[in-house]
């Protein structure tokens, strides 16, 4: 078979599996955005450590390294580009199936093509961001330099941005689903904006993982013990 299958790529493959399952489960029936957010966090967890794990193998060939870069970007597009869109679609459909309330009426009054446009803009921005990062990473590799900063918001930030928004819906006691799509547009703009972010070290990664784990636990609590399922 073509490709590579040693332990250095397992987390990337697991992230893609999590994203794929999340996409289908999220869009089942009336829509389950909270479940989708849980899968999104799992993708973020895998992404946080896939590079660290890959670098533990000594003597990786240039082909193995390039393969790892390619599958990482392709997986990120599915996990942090497509899955948040599916969560947004599930959010729209779950609101449509709720009992009448002012927020649901607001959602119903907006033509669905508007939401599709938001989804397209978001995925396109994520793809452009990933492709641009690959170009810069390849140039740095040719010069023998390590990537120390990111240009634009990394797409993996989606794993920590969207789940808290779903939790916020419960904390405020009312449906603020419409703002999810505004956040998507803002994040899309940040993906392609020209500003630099320092690449986090191990300590920074562990802090983000801790935040993600907390979000994951809270989402499960809300999903199974909350007053209502969204």
Question: For the regions a protein language model found, what residue spans apply to each?
Answer:
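Topogenic membrane-insertion module of multi-pass membrane proteins
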Residues: 1-51, 190-230
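Interhelical loop and helix-boundary elements at the membrane-water interface
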Residues: 1-16, 55-78, 130-157, 193-207
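Multi-pass membrane catalytic core of lipid/isoprenoid biosynthesis enzymes
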Residues: 9-13, 56-130
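Lipid-exposed faces of alpha-helical membrane segments in multi-pass integral membrane proteins
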Residues: 11-17, 39-42, 78-81, 117-124, ...
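Hydrophobic alpha-helical transmembrane segments
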Residues: 16-25, 50-54, 93, 100-102, ...
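Helix-coil boundary and interhelical linker segments in multi-pass alpha-helical membrane proteins
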Residues: 21-37, 84-119, 165-179, 221-230
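C-terminal membrane-associated helical module and adjoining short loops/tails
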Residues: 138-230
């Amino acid at each position: 078979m073509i490709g590579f299958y040693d332990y250095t790529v397992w987390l990337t493959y697991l992230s893609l599996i999590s994203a794929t399952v999340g996409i289908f489960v999220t869009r089942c029936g009336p829509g389950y955005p909270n479940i989708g957010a849980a899968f999104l966090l799992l993708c973020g967890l895998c992404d946080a450590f896939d590079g660290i794990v890959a670098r533990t193998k000594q003597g990786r060939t240039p082909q193995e390294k390039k393969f790892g870069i390619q599958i990482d970007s392709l997986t990120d597009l599915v996990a942090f580009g497509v899955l948040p869109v599916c969560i947004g679609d599930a959010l729209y459909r779950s609101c449509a199936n709720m009992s009448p309330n002012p927020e649901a009426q607001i959602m119903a009054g907006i033509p669905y093509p508007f939401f599709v446009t938001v989804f397209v803009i978001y995925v396109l921005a994520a793809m452009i961001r990933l492709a641009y990062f690959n170009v810069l990473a390849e140039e740095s590799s040719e010069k023998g330099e390590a990537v120390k900063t990111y240009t634009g918001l990394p797409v993996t930030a989606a794993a920590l941005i969207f789940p808290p928004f779903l939790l916020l819906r419960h904390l405020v006691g009312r449906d603020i689903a419409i703002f999810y799509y505004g956040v998507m547009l803002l994040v899309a703009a940040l993906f392609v904006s020209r500003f630099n972010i320092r690449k986090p070290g191990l300590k920074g990664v562990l802090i983000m993982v801790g935040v993600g784990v907390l979000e994951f636990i809270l989402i499960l609590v809300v999903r199974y013990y909350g007053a209502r399922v969204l």
